């Protein structure tokens, strides 16, 4: 087994050769084009795709539900404040003067309204763009123990490639065409500006984080979001089994850079 970035050396050293593909499985009916491109060198297929690494948005589902409830409560509270004022001569009935059963019914109705609206917020909560992510960070009243809404490894391009990968061209699809390089284009520059703003917003110092540390912080409930790779599922499930992870979590595609610029994950 070799990683795709070692295939060129293996081929040039005579340790790998063109795959005969006698059964005809090396096509997009069986593999995504990205996988086929990863095992292609000099327009020759020199390996079979076995597995791949990618980055994904990992989120604390319980915190996201808490955020959804907070937004529902704020919206309903705002609606109450905007109700028409009491007119002259109209009687104001204090809640304390209501019979206990009516008070209970009102509380139950209020809770039902909050829960219903919170479900709507939660159903649409996963960020589609970086702006959506920043909006959650801006409006989340973090409970005790939460140190930040999002933290990820800012040192490794692998966990940051999603934000520029759709527009930064290095070697074409297979990655070995020295004549196909374009990193100084308007789209890539815009993506990097968004990345810079994102990093500054969450104020992540590169010398204070590693991939292991940000995943551990997520397990400890210190963050709502992080960026994980293929191995994160195993690590989270192991933490859940030994009791160190005490919440529900989910995994989603990385959000787009903006409404106009797509991400790659």
Feature locations, PLM:
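Hinge/lid segment of periplasmic solute-binding proteins
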Residues: 4-56, 65-67, 74, 78, ...
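Extracytoplasmic/periplasmic solute-binding protein
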Residues: 42-50, 55, 83-180, 223
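Alpha-helical segments flanking ligand/cofactor-binding loops in enzyme cores
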Residues: 215-216
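A local structural motif
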Residues: 113-124, 177-180, 196-210, 222, ...
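Short, solvent-exposed loop/beta-turn-alpha elements that line the ligand-binding surface or hinge
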Residues: 17-31, 116-125, 169-192, 241-243, ...
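Ligand-binding clamshell of periplasmic/extracellular solute-binding protein-like
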Residues: 1-36, 49-59, 124-134, 150-162, ...
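Glycine-centered hinge/linker elements that transmit conformational signals in sensory
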Residues: 134-140, 176-211, 254
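Sec-exported extracytoplasmic/periplasmic mature domains
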Residues: 11-15, 62-69, 138-145, 196-203, ...
